[in-house]
Structures are given as structure tokens and as C-alpha cells.
Amino acid sequence: MKILFTPNWTVHHLDADDDLIQPPDKQVVGQGYWFFKYFPKGYQVDIIDRGRKSWFRDLEKKIKFYIKQPIRAFKCRNDYDIVVSHGAQSGLVYELLCSFVKNKPPHLMFDIGGLNGARINHYETPLIRFALRKCPYILVHTSRQVDFYREHYPELAEKVRFIPYGVDCKYFVPQPSVERTRTILTFGKAKRDNVTLCEAFARIADKRGYRLIVVGEPELSKRYDYLDEIIFRSVIPLPELMQLMAESDFIVIPLPEFLYSYGQMSFLQSMAMGKAAIITRTTSSRDYIEKAPGVIGVEPYDIDGMKHALEEMMDMTDAQRDAIGMANRSYATSRYDEREMSKAICDYINEIVNG
């Protein structure tokens, strides 16, 4: 089976592996790509990414839609058994182009961002309905998005499939030999509510010798420059981040509320590494954390709730945090491993192509 994959990011094509680049962002010669590498033999995956940085890509970023990528995919669509687009930025444009022709393979669109950020209004919604009037297949990583489609795009609901996100649990593993540094770690460069976390940490009178490391939002440093216990860092390479994860006593992933998928990679990687965690209960996280044995859930924007959760984690012994952290790993590996996601996606693709 020939699959054309159009991700909404740039894929680096490498002759040799580079550990500084995460798997979705790289394709190494002679190796399978991302979750497709677990597909059985007989599948060929070609990639058309969003392209290198240019003035035109800057324009696409402003209008929040990709143009060149879906046009390239449209031109070669009939060379493939299925086109899989990751993200509506190009998926909607590709689907719009295909709606005017008869000859086309089936189209599976990963809807990560709720089509247009899950906004419903008199301007965008009719345009989206028009673009999707031929009803492509849609994959989401949070179950509440299925309800969103039932309510606002009922004609598409039967073709929406919830498949949980998965991370590489053989790569993200506990590192018990790494010495702890009495730190709390949070990381992520987008869609984080670090203000709630920092405010909650600031209100704790007895910080028990803890420092909070915030990776990914250095611009907040001026706001909290009166607190030596909060350290802000820019985005760092993955190996360095994993070292900080291993050194931390526990991890916090503070999330704002949106009606789509975000933050899942971060908290599942943390759980796979055997870390106790505090995670905000949002549309994106509820499917994954409600039954997680080593996660304390906090409501969005709840500073007092975050403060109590931090104090609860701080008051645990190292042995207690290690125990619930390893329970998190068992939970994540049994439900949210990348291989399980790959199998579910492969089965769905076969169902689409073969009827």
C-alpha cells in the first residue's frame, strides 16, 4: 500500500540519525518514519512536509493555512492508495481541492487543533463545512472532539475515529541511576498555563528546598525575578530535557483549556519515564489521566488547587513518589505506547482503503 503523508511541520531528511531531533521531525535514510515504522511490510510512506522557511511560509503562517503543501499533494494524489494529512492547516485545503474532482484516493485527516481552534461562528464554520462537504475520514486524539463533531459537524461524525496518542515507551524510560536535584520541572513551548503554576509555587511559604524549573517560556522571568527558586530556561535539546526530567522529583504539565489536542506528548513522555506528575484536567488530558495512578489532577486556572497539589507532592517521600511514578509508567506502557497507536492507525487505514 502506498501512503502519502503530509505533516504540518518540517521533516529533516537525514543520512544518519540525530538524537537532538525528535522522531516526528526526522526521517533517517534506511529507517522507518515515526509510527509508520511499526506497520507490517508492504507499506510505502512518502512525505510532503510544509517546506523550509521562506517568505511564502511566513505568509502561510499569518493566514494559518498551508497552500504549497496541499497543492503538491493534490497533484500527485492518484499515485497513492490514501493521503494522510496531519493537521487541518493543509488538510482542509487539500480536501477543498479534492472536492472538485472525481478521481482521488481516500483522505484521512488528523484533526489535532479542532479544525480552526474549535471556533464556531458565522464566518469560518460555513467555509469549513463547504471544504469538508465530501466527508473525509478524521482521526482525533481526544474523545471530546468526537462530541464536538456530533454537535457542530454531524454529517462528518460517522467518519471520526478517536485513537489515543502514544509515545515511544522504549525510548522514554526511567533513569534510576540519575541523582535527584530537589527540583520540580515543567516544560513545553506552547499552550501552557505557567502563570498558574508559578503563582501557586510563589504562594507556598515553605518550599521545602525545592526549585521550580520552567523550560520553554523564558519571557516570564521578569515577572518572577523576585523569586530565586524559579528558574526559567529557553527550549533545549531533547537529551538535555530528558536529563532534567530524570533529575526532577516530579513533573508538572499545566494546561489551559481548549477543545482539541495538546500537551499529550509531554505528559505521556513524563509518565513513561516513571515520574509522578501534576497535570491539569482539560479536554486534551482527561482521557489519559483520569485513571492514572501517579497523577494529581488540577482544574484549569485553579491557583489554590495547584498549590495544594504541589504541597501534596512535596510532602511525599522519595520512595512514595518513585512508587507512583513507576505505576504511571506501567499505566502508560500498557495503554499509550506508540506501537499501540501505530497498530490502531494501521487498522483504520486498512479499513478505509479496503472498505
Question: What is the meaning of each model-derived region?
Answer:
Residues I71-D79, A118-I138:
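Membrane-proximal helix-turn-helix segments that form the acceptor-binding/catalytic region
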Residues P136-E158:
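A short, active-site helix/loop in glycosyltransferases that binds the activated sugar's phosphate group
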Residues R150-E151, P164-T181:
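Acidic anion/phosphate-binding donor-loop and adjacent secondary structure
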Residues P176-A202, I213:
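Conserved donor-binding/catalytic core segment of Leloir-type glycosyltransferases
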Residues G216-M245, F250:
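Nucleotide-activated donor-binding/catalytic signature segment of Leloir-type glycosyltransferases, i.e.
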Residues M245-Y260, K275-A276:
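Acidic donor-binding loop of glycosyltransferase active sites
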Residues K291-D304, E311-D318:
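Conserved acidic donor-binding segment of nucleotide-sugar-dependent glycosyltransferases
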Residues E312, A319-R335, A344-D347:
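A short, well-ordered alpha-helix in the C-terminal region of glycosyltransferases
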